Each structure stands twice: as structure tokens, then as C-alpha cells.
Amino acid sequence: MSTNYKTILVPVDGSDASLKALDRAIELAKFYSSKLAIAHVIDVRSYSLAIAYREPLEEYAEDNATKILAQAAQKAQDAGLTDVVTIKKEGSPRSAIAKKIAPEVQADLIVMGATGYGMIEKMFVGSVSESTVRHSTCDIMIVR
């Protein structure tokens, strides 16, 4: 059975792992002539820890998200893709990717970077890719 992915979603956060996933998503979008949806989730949970610095932190996170998405979109366009959209959301990346963004863009495939969490970090933070695999209804590719 042959699968044709119409919309490929790639979450990016500026990390090396997400940039590798972006490269793979671009390759796949070119191969399948797919729409590429590039998403960034601003994790607002971290602002509650520093109420005095909430506004500057939110502004920095917003600016950083805009920069990350612009660079990723430019990379995709430089590679020859013409159907590229960017999505910026606030919330928990662990739930937003699979439960909100993927259904909104009607993603057939999510391409994500593997995280480098150790056992202790994973217990406290959890893995975004692991949560996305658990909650997604479409295919997922984890890139190492």
C-alpha cells in the first residue's frame, strides 16, 4: 500500500533535534508534493514560576518563536517548497502538537526530533515526542 502524505507537520523549537526533523520533513514534502506545516509551541507553564519577569519572558518567547518559524520557513522555501505555513501556539507542547495543531492542519504525518532526555529528566519533564506518539491519530516519524 502506498501512502501519499498531503500535509506534513514538523514542530520546531530551535534545537538540533528539531532542525534534523525539519530537514527530513522538507525532503518528504518535496517527495510527496506535500504542504509543510511548521509549528512552534510557546510553553506558557514556565512563566508562572517568575511572576516578576512574566512580561519580558513572554515577549522574549514570542520573539524567539517568530524567529525560529521564519528561519524554518525560509529554509523550506529555499529548498523549493511553495506550500509552507507556520503555526504559533501557546500551551504545553506535549498536548498541543497532537491534540490541537495536527487536527487543525489535517496532518497526515508528524515528523519530530528525538529528545535527549535521560531517565531522571524524563520523569519530571516528560518527552514531547513520546506524548505526541501516544495522542496522535496520524503517522509519526521520529528523527534521530
What are these regions (language model features)?
Residues E55-K67:
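A short acidic, glycine-rich active-site loop
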Residues R45-S46, P93, M119:
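Generic structural signal for helix capping and beta-alpha/helix-loop junctions
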Residues S2-A52, K75, A79:
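Small/aliphatic-rich secondary-structure junction motif
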Residues A39, V85-K89, M141:
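General small-molecule cofactor/ligand-binding pocket signal
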Residues M1-T3, Q74-I110:
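Structural beta-alpha unit
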